[in-house]
């Protein structure tokens, strides 16, 4: 089953992030009632918590076109112009990893977002081109990396939090049902406990479970044993997590910086910051200090 098939299409289908979804639903209903345009929206939070899902649900609720871009692929203004000039009125333009936009593109978007006007140069002459009113939705794992003027142009700002285990178990039940799989509540909870509070990781765990049962239909291994084979322990830690923690353990209490950890483990700094550390910090496995990272006492 594809990610798109697993992804909720409406607010009512989204499990978790209730406060965020409720607030956005109020704004969306108000826009529909007043025949208005959804304000520009910034969604911040760790990877895999549903930023893309929420953006897609907003467009579906508004019944408007959705244009999806990744800022990593936008190197200059020319990369984004076709979308801005070709979009239908009231469209949603969703930019994932928006903190990666070059500053020149950020600055170009100021009048686009504020006045719905393109300021471009044609044959060495400045021209202003009116655009249809639209909604820009930005997703980021690093809201503080946006320039202040760009950040301020997002009227709505929401932060996504990690899921609790009961929410993930509920989501697991829903997604497994789409695969034709039914599990006991205790098994659902155990999978949830191994998913780091993150729906994207949960879905990867579910896919592993499904594949394992396809290959071993008569196997009676427990949930724990099935995930032990994948290298996922009872706390959800994987090979990279353990490499990270073992590196700190070998430092014998001496703080290690990101560059040192990356050099020793071979794991990219961005992966450490965005995918490994948030969960380890939240669960108390590590402590960030001014001098570097040290082991905590979970």
Label each PLM-derived region with a short phrase.
Residues 2-23, 233-235:
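Dynamic helix-loop-helix/coil hinge segments at AAA+ ATPase domain boundaries and subdomain interfaces
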Residues 25, 145-179, 184-193, 204-205:
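Conserved AAA+ ATPase core "coupling" helix
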Residues 29-71, 82-89:
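Walker A/P-loop
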Residues 57-58, 77, 89-120, 143-153:
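Conserved AAA+/SF3 P-loop NTPase catalytic/coupling segment centered on the Walker-B
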Residues 122-139, 154:
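AAA+/SF3 P-loop NTPase mechanochemical coupling elements
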Residues 188-189, 206, 210-233, 241, ...:
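Conserved C-terminal helix/linker of AAA+ ATPases
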Residues 189-194, 200-215, 243-246, 260, ...:
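C-terminal helical "lid" of AAA+/P-loop NTPase domains
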Residues 252-298:
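Terminal-proximal interaction/regulatory segments of ATP-powered molecular machines
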